A protein has these predicted regions:
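N-terminal Rossmann-like NAD(P)+-binding domain of SDR-like oxidoreductases, especially those catalyzing
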Residues: 1-187
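Amphipathic alpha-helical recognition patches that constitute DNA-binding helices
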Residues: 151, 159, 180, 195, ...
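C-terminal substrate-binding subdomain of Rossmann-fold SDR/epimerase-dehydratase oxidoreductases
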Residues: 23, 205-207, 212-343
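Mobile, glycine-enriched helix-loop/loop "lid" segments at the mouths of ligand-binding/catalytic clefts
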Residues: 122-133, 191-219
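Short, flexible, glycine-rich and Lys/Arg-enriched loop motifs at helix boundaries
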Residues: 2-3, 182-203, 218-235
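The catalytic Tyr-centered alpha-helix of NAD(P)H-dependent dehydrogenases
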Residues: 148-156, 197, 201-204, 236-240
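Short clusters of hydrophobic/aromatic residues that line enzyme substrate/ligand-binding pockets
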Residues: 78, 118-121, 193, 221, ...
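A short beta-to-alpha transition loop/helix N-cap that caps and shapes the active-site region
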Residues: 111-113, 186-189, 272, 298-300
Length: 343
């Protein structure tokens, strides 16, 4: 482990890191003030704050709680941070003239709509009246709304999207992109950066790694009675590197101001058992599993249709499920088996 972290220290990113809660207005103000730039002229003699500009060209928002089960147990915690925090933070960014914003949304907003058995389009859950042409070439009109939300976490993401949509309508200087993640897995191909949550792992891949490493005895599979080919839940797994490229594409794409939503997924659905089999193939280790009951808030299928991102952001996934598994296995080999948390 020591060698692992000594190696990572040589890979120095050109980043300046600040430790602060984004809900702490004083702390965030101090950070943003460090990037103030002189305005060429004062835009408003009445309100000098409107002349404020910043060397920060854009902000990516990752500051949300994200566990479905925890959101069901502690909804106010999620509404306070995810929704309340976003409102105050965007207000502060506006004061500093920072109005290019990328928001981490989630495929969770589709809720039970995901169980229709078709790849999900952004129009299946829309903030605005939308007209599109479906797969049969027919023009469809979709009213604003999102039915079937199954948990407070998903509702916070939907509420945040609505707030950001309203903000972009009210102030046309804002460029706001909401990225609906499907199921991120994998890690950097170097094996130096990987996922080992300090708290109890809630995502599938970190739990799989803990079982392989011996930190956990067995992998619980939540339900084998879904309407899917093998009965286990089907998800659209996307490599974190592809996800990162999607954020960069969103930051660079400023041709049209306003609010826009994109799915970030591969368009390929794979089951829990298929992921386990892929990880067993890569690691050449057997992963013990047991079937337990479904979890509250889960759906059977959730797969993206990512055509909009392909066309408008020139983005698509490049890495397969097998690549994801190889990369996380490389990380586990670097840190050493048995060193992962057993939370």
């Amino acid at each position: 482990v020591t060698d692992h972290y000594q190696n990572t220290s040589k890979l120095r990113p050109t980043l300046k890191l600040y430790r602060a809660d984004y809900r702490d207005e004083q702390a965030m103000t101090r950070i943003l003030e460090a990037y103030d730039t002189p305005a060429p002229f004062q835009l408003s003699p009445i309100d000098p704050e409107t002349s404020r500009t910043s060397s920060i060209s854009g902000v990516i928002h990752f500051a949300a709680y994200k566990a479905v089960g925890e959101s069901i147990r502690s909804p106010l915690k999620y509404y306070s941070n995810n929704v309340g925090g976003l409102i105050n933070f965007c207000s502060l960014l506006g004061d500093f003239g920072i109005k290019n914003f990328v928001f981490s949304s989630s495929a969770t907003v589709y809720g039970t709509v995901a169980d229709m058995g078709v790849a999900l389009r952004e129009e299946h859950c829309s903030q605005n009246l939308t007209v599109f042409v479906d797969e049969d070439g027919k023009k469809q009109m979709v009213q604003p709304g999102c039915s079937g939300l199954t948990n407070p976490y998903g509702r916070t993401k939907w509420m945040c999207e609505a707030i950001l949509n309203d903000l972009a309508h009210a102030d046309p200087e804002w460029t706001i992109t909401a990225l609906r993640y499907f199921n991120p897995i994998g890690c950097d191909e170097s094996g130096h950066l990987g996922e080992d949550p300090r708290d109890a792992a809630t995502n599938l891949m970190p739990v799989v790694l803990r079982v392989i490493s011996g930190a956990l005895p067995v992998l619980n599979i939540y339900g084998d009675d879904y309407d899917t080919p093998d009965g286990t839940a089907v998800r659209d797994y996307i490599h974190v590197t592809d996800l990162a490229r999607g954020h960069l594409a969103a930051l660079k794409s400023r041709a049209d101001r306003g609010f826009r939503v994109y799915n970030l997924g591969s368009g390929r659905g794979q089951s829990v058992l298929e992921l386990v089999a892929a990880m067993e193939e890569v690691s050449q280790r057997k992963i013990p599993t047991q079937i337990v009951g479904r979890r509250e808030g889960d759906v059977g299928m959730c797969v993206a249709k990512a055509t909009r991102a392909e066309i408008e952001l020139a983005w698509r996934t490049e890495k397969s499920l097998e690549t994801c598994c190889r990369d996380v296995w490389r990380f586990l080999e670097r840190v050493g088996n048995g060193t992962l948390s057993n939370a």
